[in-house]
Amino acid sequence: MGKFYYSNRRLACWAAGKNPHLGGSVEQWLAAINTDPSFRQTVKEDVQENREQPTAVRMFSWKVGSGPIDNPEKCDWHFVLTGERPAPSRPVKADEVVVVPQPKKVVIPTPPPPPAPYFRAVGAFAPTRSEFVRAIVERLTRLREESRAAALFAELPLEYPQGAPLKLSLAAKFAMLKHTTWRKWYDTSDERLLEAHPGGPCLPPPPPIQNPPSFQERVREFCRMKSCTKAFALETSLGLNKAWVGLVDIPSTSVCCADGKTTGGQTIAQEADPLQHRISTSVAPGRAQWISERRQALRRREQANSFEGLAAQTDMTFEQARNAYLGAADMIEQGLPLLPPLRSAYAPRGLWRGPSTRANYTLDFRLNGIPTGTNTLEILYNPVSEEEMEEYRDRGMSAVVIDALEIAINPFGMPGNPTDLTVVATYGHERDMTRAFIGSASTFLGNGLARAIFFPGLQYSQEEPRRESIIRLYVASTNATVDTDSVLAAISVGTLRQHVGSMHYRTVASTVHQAQVQGTTLRATMMGNTVVVSPEGSLVTGTPEARVEIGGGSSIRMVGPLQWESVEEPGQTFSIRSRSRSVRIDRNVDLPQLEAEPRLSSTVRGLAGRGVIYIPKDCQANRYLGTLNIRDMISDFKGVQYEKWITAGLVMPTFKIVIRLPANAFTGLTWVMSFDAYNRITSRITASADPVYTLSVPHWLIHHKLGTFSCEIDYGELCGHAMWFKSTTFESPRLHFTCLTGNNKELAADWQAVVELYAELEEATSFLGKPTLVFDPGVFNGKFQFLTCPPIFFDLTAVTALRSAGLTLGQVPMVGTTKVYNLNSTLVSCVLGMGGTVRGRVHICAPIFYSIVLWVVSEWNGTTMDWNELFKYPGVYVEEDGSFEVKIRSPYHRTPARLLAGQSQRDMSSLNFYAIAGPIAPSGETAQLPIVVQIDEIVRPDLSLPSFEDDYFVWVDFSEFTLDKEEIEIGSRFFDFTSNTCRVSMGENPFAAMIACHGLHSGVLDLKLQWSLNTEFGKSSGSVTITKLVGDKAMGLDGPSHVFAIQKLEGTTELLVGNFAGANPNTRFSLYSRWMAIKLDQAKSIKVLRVLCKPRPGFSFYGRTSFPV
């Protein structure tokens, strides 16, 4: 496939052709792509996914500018859709044009274009509303330009001294010259325009010459100016050097939802009441003196006014707002915003420049129906318009600070309505919701108006992409009972913001700063008994952990006459090790005036079951402690979740496991909690729990020194299917508890730990979820899950000890003669070998009075005890629990995935742990010091060729038949097979291992049967019959059948693996499904019958587990 060349026009044509049901012209799609980079990327990814289609090749394989659709006036859609070029209707010579030399003419330059109207495509294309919005924006833009010109040359305020000479600066004179030039271009009396534009320019008529205003007009203007005195005084008192202020109504079009619709299927009434935005014109240099005098007069007036006068002017004082934040009981409920006045919230930067701040409502929408449950409404919101950003960017501002965010909920309906409503505000450009959380406000609709304010201190760059997602609002309810088509609430969002320059701190009044430091203004309640939640603290303490890899290079050096060699310079690593770090701190804890809150009695939510694990006082390694059946824990507890489970039937929950145990750093105990969903290892660990069994399934390490332990088990991710409320034959989720490293000191008595199971059991919509694994020869990408090596023990001795962990990770672990297949070794076995950097963790599972210093390196073929050579290897010091990264050392840059017969782990690459200092312990201690190594991934893996390409795998061989009439039944279980009338030999390959270490599988298999004969080729007779069936022999259905002569020696067929539920479990004929029968009428004459299988793309596996055999 050739190279594709992309442009916005080509992507717009592709989107318009793919979505004819949405309507809209190519130019409208082009406008959406130009203004939304994320939408452009989505269209580009769609083209890349369909790059094999002929239409995509014809549209994007041409260089930009020479394609069939690049010219908007001559788009060859017939060629794009059919690939046919129209035949010429006459000879080509007839189309040739003879160019006659023409005398040179003077080219009149084209007039400067008028300002382009600002508009943005909103949501899906709706011609009526978009044209309405565009017309309004164009009209307002034209009015704004005319108002600017009028303010520069005509309309001076009445306060300006009449009759005084107008002193213009040099900049004003240049502006007048520019205006005169502009009028010259648009003057239709200019004869040059008739030559350049025959018929006259299509331009609006020139504005009429303005006469001096009459007395009536001046009186009318005086009354209009008096109505704007308060707004004008407020603007000028803040130091905004504006020459003219007006009030313009702009429709509320700032509500933007993903894909033009809400995520919860709700609708937003965008035809909200118009918002009042102040639009200020450019600076008028000619009136700088008048503005300065006006500002000084207003400041003297403000200083003369008393505190009560200021409160009467602003309708709210800062102390009243602060009491509202703290939820004072004596606060008078009134319909006022919680945002304090600007002069009280901010301190001015200087005499001539005030803070660039706006306090107004920038989002106002009505809620039609309340989303419930998981049907949450998401609203994308940008608090700062592009015009405002561009205006302050021209002034040198580089960032925007959102200091205050107010959420106001005005409900509609009956008083006392217990319908709850929650609005959550997050930072839209943060992927981690814990860090993005700004605050949430919850109220009951029957409590009336509810307001809340937050101080996020959110700062983002002026160069932020123009996306409507700076603030994300989520609206949800849990018990809405009203009609979905009724308007339930009006939600308004206000911001208090300022624009700051590079290396400038934001300016905040001392009272606001003090309140923010104390944490008192981080929570707010004013009306409706609003419950407000917001994060506390902002400073991150501790030392950040940094690791910067500085890559090496190569150079050429001379080693002899006309001889050079390439010298590789190794890379260096700059790192800072973090010893203590807190993501968030509570700034209230250091305040001396605040007292610690007492412990309160509480109950837990979501508790579904509980169990007890008994631990002996002398708990040794490999000790089996007990098993908890998850289904029995929930049913025996008989709580609310079990009742919900009975009602739902099928659930796919995320379990939270909490194991409450007292912390003790003197025992050195480490346990393993293994999640065995299909009851594969229960019978293997009841006597002695070998770590190979317990670590082959999903597991978690529990350290006694850390105390109470918790984790989450995503049943849908680990199993890929739903869970029935009663026991089934193919799954039985259990938690096995075993001891990995025993205690050094015997405790006083046996004890117990409590296991709590939390879950929200909601109904699942289907039985199958996302597959755990989809077959692909190149499925291994270097990442592991639940890869833990068995414990490594060091003796208390002065001799330097060495312990190794092999890196032949594709080798199947064994316990005696039993092979234990697991998913990690299966994935690695898909490749011949691998290289890269091993990233993992070391857990020192010893009592607190044990200590050791380890040197972790990678070595090839043996060990190095020469210290001078050893410490030249790249390695990592380990003194406590922590992570490490070590590059795999090998003369081939890779290590094999599996071993040959007679080889050991140390013959290849291995991770070696040298005890260069220690281990040490107090006198009387004789127990060994154990460590546990976990491998997380191979960073930047260097993978070899796949073990097998897209080819057939040997599944099973049948030989030594004892009967002539033989029938072999092939069900859903492909890993193992047994027979009493012939010898069975199973093939070992990655596909068979994948089936072994999963609970269910489904897909299509291509089968190939091959056989050899005992007798001479020409003297044999008989046939091989392959029949496809559904169900069982007694009540099932017969499908197609293939008969092959025994002398043909091979045959092919296919088999759909799956049952009525979608996927087959690893059991034989337990569910209504498809299967296949192979019948032989002269089986003794066949020496070997071999069955090969080849999975087709999309063959899926569900439920991670292991298989000891």
Swiss-Prot record:
Pfam families: NeA_P2, Nepo_coat, Nepo_coat_C, Nepo_coat_N. The keyword Amino-acid biosynthesis does not apply. GO terms for cellular component: host cell cytoplasm; host cell nucleus; host cell plasmodesma; viral capsid. Its main location: host cell. One of its GO terms (molecular function) is structural molecule activity. Virions are comprised of 60 copies of the coat protein. GO terms for biological process: transport of virus in host, cell to cell. It comes from Grapevine fanleaf virus. This is RNA2 polyprotein. Keywords: Capsid protein, Host cell junction, Host cytoplasm, Host nucleus, Transport, Viral movement protein, Virion. Specific enzymatic cleavages in vivo by the P1 encoded 3C-like protease yield mature proteins. Belongs to the nepoviruses RNA2 polyprotein family. It is found in: Host cell junction, Host plasmodesma. InterPro entries: Nepo_coat, Nepo_coat_C, Nepo_coat_N, Nepovirus_subgr_A_2A, Viral_coat.
